[in-house]
């Protein structure tokens, strides 16, 4: 068996007060307009007991550590390694009997490895008598296989939901599902967070006077309309059509973008092919500059090279998926953290309070 991989313990915060929203000695509470978004404010003192714990797989332990630091909790100790034949081995290395446990693990590339880790960790926690297990899945792999679009194919996202439930998960916390109806595939409660508060706050600070939010396809119109409303901006849509077989898609821009700053909004950037084509169509339609933002930076294949060589001014993503070294070194890619958003949701679930206050 190979050497175990152990998440390091994050020491408790030294001053876990009310953070930016707190009234400090001799200082008045700042105006609401100057405060950070609710999802990014430091929480009130987390209850320092051993009845709630946060663990992480290897998919995004940096995000898990940030969440723990935000809440003033240590990261739970777990051993994750492989046997010589490639089988995954996990062991929970501390007592979880009667604890409210949160397991942070996006099922990103390599998807099957991270999914198997998650299933085994859930099973280990259940057999160790954890009182409740909440799977925190910032990026839900297989979400794009949510229906039968061809004969004799599986509905993979439904199968994954069943596997998580069968393994012993009592609750799920997810961020920006590709298809919101996936919540209905679960037989357990699902809290569906949106990264919009983090992304809206980032672009509000830029104070674009002529912003138009753009949906890259018809399926994303509702998401773009919601974002445009929060940004008090115009809305445009790019309609892709293939006029003939074996003929390149023609992209029609619906809406006024001439001389304006355009912001392409999507939930996932995978190969970045659609993103770059949308950017080119907007520039050809007279857009002054084009930005893009998405929650999940899958960035597979030639994505980073395409972004680098494109006319995009900036691509803003979140850390639901860790970037590769090439992604971190690409100056056009900017990362905003969702650790505060997820941390607030975890605290609300543990304290049995409403999670909806985190929504825009």
Regions found by a protein language model. Name each.
Residues 1-360:
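PRPP-associated nucleotide enzymes
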């Amino acid at each position: 068996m190979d050497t175990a991989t152990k998440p390091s313990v994050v020491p408790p915060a030294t001053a876990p007060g009310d953070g930016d929203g707190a009234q400090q000695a001799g200082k008045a509470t700042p105006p609401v307009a100057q405060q950070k978004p609710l999802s990014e404010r430091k929480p009130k003192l987390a209850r320092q007991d051993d009845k709630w714990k946060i663990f992480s797989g290897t998919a995004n332990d940096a995000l898990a550590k940030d969440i723990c630091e935000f809440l003033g909790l240590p990261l739970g100790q777990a051993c994750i390694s492989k046997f010589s034949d490639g089988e995954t081995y996990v062991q929970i290395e501390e007592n979880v009997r009667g604890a409210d446990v949160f397991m942070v693990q996006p099922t990103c590339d390599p998807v099957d490895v991270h999914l198997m880790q998650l299933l085994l960790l859930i099973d280990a926690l259940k057999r160790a008598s954890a009182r409740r297990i909440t799977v925190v899945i910032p990026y839900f792999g297989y979400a794009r296989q949510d229906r039968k679009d061809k004969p004799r194919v599986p509905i993979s996202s439904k199968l994954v939901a069943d596997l998580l439930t069968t393994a012993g998960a009592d609750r799920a916390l997810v961020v920006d599902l590709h298809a919101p109806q996936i919540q209905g595939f679960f037989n357990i409660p699902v809290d569906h967070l949106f990264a919009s508060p983090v992304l809206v706050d980032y672009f509000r600070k830029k104070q674009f006077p002529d912003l138009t939010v753009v949906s890259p396809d018809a399926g994303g119109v509702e998401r773009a309309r919601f974002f445009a409303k929060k940004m008090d901006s115009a809305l445009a849509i790019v309609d892709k059509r293939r006029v003939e077989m074996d003929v390149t898609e023609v992209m029609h821009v619906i809406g006024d973008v001439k001389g304006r700053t355009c912001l392409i909004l999507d939930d996932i950037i995978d190969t970045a092919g659609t993103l770059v084509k949308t950017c080119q169509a907007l520039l050809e339609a007279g857009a002054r500059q084009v930005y893009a933002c998405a929650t999940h930076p899958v960035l597979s294949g030639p994505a980073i090279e395409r972004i680098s060589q494109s006319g995009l001014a900036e691509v803003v993503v979140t850390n639901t998926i860790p970037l590769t070294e090439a992604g971190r070194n690409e100056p056009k890619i900017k990362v905003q953290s969702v650790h505060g958003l997820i941390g607030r949701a975890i605290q609300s679930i543990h304290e049995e309070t409403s999670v909806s206050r985190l929504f825009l």
